[in-house]
A protein has these predicted regions:
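Hydrophobic face of amphipathic alpha-helices that form TPR/SEL1-like repeat modules
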Residues: 1-27
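Rossmann-like NAD(P) dinucleotide-binding subdomain of oxidoreductase/dehydrogenase enzymes
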Residues: 121-267, 315, 391
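Glycine-rich loop-to-alpha-helix module at the N-terminal edge of alpha/beta enzyme cores
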Residues: 32-118, 130
Length: 494
């Protein structure tokens, strides 16, 4: 049985813990590896190694740091197929989707390789006679990242490349449910030249999360995951004086106007609602049909019925949920939708895949006539379940969306520029897709979820990522001419 190792001070080592967590193939329930609950002593060793390495790493030339990530992105490309296969085995998403997971992280690594153009301060000459002022963006120190199960390649690559490229050292805690692809990415980072102690990896559940939040030498924590855990991390990390960013739960709505291109809209809706078995924080889990678009129900159902559920080992449309507990939760919420009066027009419960009868499978599920007081609307289901709602006008749809506490993402499908402009201006959501089912985050733009979906004023990606992992130091300088003197100045004037 494979035992997942830790990375401490440049060495891949097995934990001394007595507590090991099973990693299972979600299509078969086979235990494929075990991951440790890292001990407190081992966490302290990792932080100490990062603290020591920081003193050298922060002074390493920025071009040297950039070259490491140039090599790293090349290694990821060379190992793309291997990484996708590992990801599918432990997480369950299809091979094609797994490649996308890795590729979206790769884009952030490429962005980190351009750090010399990103970590640039400001300079103003002659702010006063003979006085110059400049600001520099310096690294914070030891930073940490806590990542979820649903994107075990992309989200770790959101975090440690930008943190390390800006001169910090890093403690990474991958999801205990699927850490193996993350560890393979870490191995490639070490191969690319990341020095000892600059990147460290610890494992486990709540005990490890709390230790990271509490450790006095960790200066910043980045988190992606559920709302409950995100609130816990933000509060606990903030109380110990850390900078924190928490990307949390979502209830993303797509608004369809009657003038939308029907075929393209239906295809994008089905992909965004049911892809990755709905286990995406950017999934479109609610569609609001405006006016005559309410007649599209049969076509929406037909698109969902055309999707093929598989074990993830091929290029079918969606794989299993991550665990039996996740499957049970999704099926329970489907049951509450029926009990509370929604119309179940497509039921994905009870589906089986030949040869994988023990898999955590739930097929595409659609509810019509959903209202805002139902649990299936109020909770993030995190499964392949689409809720259909109706609105008489765009104004009514906007009012419905703005009343929802989440603010991660939304989309509008229309051929009207005026309607799209009104939507993007009036909607209180951080990320908007126009004829796109919420755009995939790109590294040059910030991941800008808002309201109940985000805690912290800076997000991952883009300029905000550089700002999150740095602090500004302002220097005001005057060099005296030895022959010149104005005498004592007791005012605030320069």
């Amino acid at each position: 049985m494979h035992h997942v190792q830790q990375l401490i001070n440049g060495q891949f080592v097995q934990s001394n813990t007595d507590e090991w967590i099973d990693i299972t193939d979600p299509a078969t329930q086979e235990v494929i590896a075990k991951v440790p609950q890292t001990t407190n002593d081992e966490i302290n060793q990792a932080v100490a190694a990062a603290q020591t390495a920081f003193e050298t790493w922060r002074k390493t030339p920025i071009t040297t740091r950039a070259r490491i990530f140039l090599k790293y992105q090349s290694l990821i490309r060379d190992h793309m197929d291997e990484l996708a296969e590992i990801l599918t085995a432990e997480q369950g998403k299809t091979i094609a989707d797994a490649r996308g997971d890795v590729f979206r992280g790769l884009e952030v690594v490429e962005h980190a390789a351009g750090i010399a153009n990103l970590q640039i301060g400001d300079f103003v000459e002659n702010v006063a006679s003979g006085v110059d002022t400049y600001s520099i963006w310096q690294p914070l120190g030891v930073c940490a990242g806590i990542t979820p199960f649903n994107f075990p390649a992309m989200i770790p690559l959101w975090m440690f490349p930008m943190a390390i490229a800006t001169g910090n050292t890093f403690i990474l805690k991958p999801s205990e449910q699927d850490p193996m692809v993350t560890m393979r990415l870490v191995e490639l980072a070490i191969e690319a030249g990341v020095p000892e102690g600059v990147l460290n990896v610890v494992h486990g559940g709540k005990a490890t999360v709390d230790a990271i939040c509490d450790h006095p030498d960790i200066k910043a924590v980045s988190f992606v995951g559920s709302t409950n855990v995100g609130k816990h991390v933000y509060e606990r990390a903030s109380q110990s004086g850390k900078r924190a960013q928490c990307m949390m739960g979502a209830k993303n709505h797509g608004v369809i106007l009657p003038d939308a291109n029907k075929e393209q809209t239906l295809n994008q809706l089905a992909g965004a609602a049911f892809g990755a078995a709905g286990q995406r924080c950017m999934a479109l889990s609610v569609v609001v049909l405006v006016g005559a678009a309410g007649e599209w129900i049969d076509e929406i159902k037909a698109k969902a019925e055309s999707l093929v559920v598989s074990a993830g080992k091929n290029d079918k449309d969606l794989g299993p949920l991550i665990s039996p507990a996740a499957k049970a939760r999704v099926e329970h919420l489907i049951g509450t939708g029926v009990e509370e009066g929604a119309s179940l027009i497509l039921d994905g419960r009870g589906i089986t895949v030949e040869g994988f009868e023990k898999g955590n499978f739930v097929g595409p599920t659609i509810f019509d006539n959903v209202t805002s007081d139902m649990q299936i609307y109020q909770q993030e289901i995190f499964g392949p379940v689409l809720c259909i709602m109706r609105a008489n006008s765009l104004d009514e749809a906007i009012e419905l969306l703005n009343a929802n506490p989440h603010g991660n993402g939304t989309a509008i499908f229309t051929q009207s520029g005026a309607a799209a402009h009104k939507f993007q201006q009036d909607i209180q959501v951080g990320q908007i897709g126009i004829n796109l089912p919420i755009p995939v985050p790109l590294p040059m733009f910030s991941f800008s979820g808002s309201r109940g979906s985000k805690l912290g004023d800076l997000g991952p990606y883009g300029k905000q990522a550089v700002q999150f992992y740095t602090q500004t130091k302002t220097v005001t300088a005057r060099w005296f001419d030895d022959e010149a003197s104005r005498g004592v100045n007791t005012t605030i004037s320069m």
